[in-house]
């Protein structure tokens, strides 16, 4: 690495040396020398020495069974440690300017000052700032929670080590602690022995709140308020909740048979239990702090004249109620009878006494105390409520259709699934307006239908404050939305949970505005939504369906159409972005991603999924979380107050041509090429990925299905493992080359320089090209793929090369990642450590498949370690 990153290089070197010491102590210096030889050969091969590349392959393919797991683990652990050092560097006091995001709120304030925005416009936008992060347990978080805790402790040690006046003794103690942690990690099994349950996944989400976000959220709001006040004279209302968190863990049952109504109920209770326990700690600490005896008349009238410590009198009662609530929740979770006397069931019960104390402190001139812990607790309440995380419910549209189909057949009125859309809507609206029950009391539905009904009953019996929205995956028609609302009505849901269609395929995205227009034309529906409509935009499945370019353009144009339609109907539209960390799933840095959205699309707030390993990278440490939230807040405010101009018509025409041709090229390979599926299955670890205990959800929607039933996440994950990265670029090269050949290069460069959407798209390609490696993919092919399929592999690799060349020809400086030199440097650092894992993985896949049905535990374990290591090295893999 260059001198510019010397502090980061120093930390990477330190952690690497300590890892080497741990490995040498365990397996001996001779083994450590072998690891060093592999490392040096890989670096030399990366630098262009083909002879060393051959020697590296020879060395890795001739490892004994006893060496397979330790070699894989050595490189995987180094990459994990490099990730820790890099994450720490982003919040370090020695962070290089090219690595650390400049303070985004300060930068934004400068832009606002140079604009024609009025104080009122800015204040209104600040008041309306709303960001909702939806945490999901998609199966990409490779690292075990046990190791994550050790990684956090390593980060803490690095933080203490950079204190300038640390004594030699303190430094030695910290280095000793670092060595202990790295040695503990080395001697800990990297791979989960069994799949996590949905409840386990939910607890992982709770831990992220407890360990990081509980501290980060009030600090973020404090920083935001301070910057806005000092820079623009803007205030943040006390009741403001610019950030909230929701979860899919325990609520997302789309294709996951393990998420049952019972599981959802348990997760809801567990979430509240964690929240109450955290508030109990806060209130206990606040009780210690608020020992003052001066209070205002409002507080005195509540506690009485004899209370010597009025604040403590209020807080002790609150503490007692929290203890009772915790005991009641514990009993319920253990299937015991609970005493529900004096328990807290709403945020209001907790907030009102705290507000009484807060205003009293203000009124008595104790502003510094009022602006301390009690304000932090109030802001936590605004963010987390009494439930910690709201829970979204997600279910496939087909399951609701099957429920109504079974019902109508029982009633003898036909088969709902066989009706056309008009007949479905007529039936649904008739029953939605009918006061008599539709479900017969003697009806005994099938187990699958009963599960749908039980889930809706859980929704009906849950405090609305604990729920987010109900999402319908693979939504295609207005009836898909009305069907959910009818089922909820029939199970007795007393409130109107927002119901959001999720448009996932290319056709469904293009048809989304027409579907919503039909719904907005229904009087009953307009009354139900009360002026607010949630719509979810699918990124991963649309890219898998049509290729990344066509999917991105459909996402953009569908959002434009939905924004326009909602404005015409005076409806507040909340777009929910189902993005991931990979390019094939919409992954891009927060600011770039948000500012490349259509103008006006963030007016209703930001709602976005944070998935898998990205939760840890963005929110795993309090300082990192504050940084991430600042970036999101600045981007949303900028997008709403200083939106990018709408694209010119000629840009749109070029983009449409790019989209159409890239979709055709993508589908030609994926759908029409007869060798594609067998090639995919043999050249990637797709089958083996199904064995890895990643998440609770199966990798396929239907166990017997082919590519079309494979979930988008394992589809992308498999291609990233062999470094072809196919979902992130396939289809783009040929279509872009056609545009260049038609003389549209000046127009494409104009789009790159002046249209954030197009600029971000090409920049994401640039990052993919730094991670992709045709030669490594070719090695997988030669080791694993039948020779008759090799010509297809060559065509795909040639296509990648063409795509890289055409993107380089299009961008003005003709070099990859010139605007993001740190990302380029980071990838260059990792590649020599990821490459041996790829070569070893190909060898392990070969050995595993040669064994047939015979299980070889050593080979399988080593294979799983390489999968984890490559994921760590590539970072945004799922």
Swiss-Prot record:
Active-site residue list: 138, 544
EC number from the UniProt entry: 4.1.1.31
Native organism: Psychromonas ingrahamii (strain DSM 17664 / CCUG 51855 / 37)
Keywords (A to Z) from UniProt: Carbon dioxide fixation, Lyase, Magnesium
PROSITE patterns linked to this entry: PEPCASE_1 (PS00781), PEPCASE_2 (PS00393)
Name of the protein: Phosphoenolpyruvate carboxylase
Lineage of origin: Bacteria, Pseudomonadati, Pseudomonadota, Gammaproteobacteria, Alteromonadales
GO cellular component, one term: cytosol
Record's signal peptide: none
GO terms assigned for molecular function: magnesium ion binding; phosphoenolpyruvate carboxylase activity
GO annotation, biological process: carbon fixation; oxaloacetate metabolic process; tricarboxylic acid cycle
Superkingdom of the source species: Bacteria
Keyword Ligase among UniProt keywords: no
Catalysed reactions, semicolon-separated: oxaloacetate + phosphate = phosphoenolpyruvate + hydrogencarbonate
Family, similarity comment: Belongs to the PEPCase type 1 family.
Pfam families: PEPcase (PF00311)
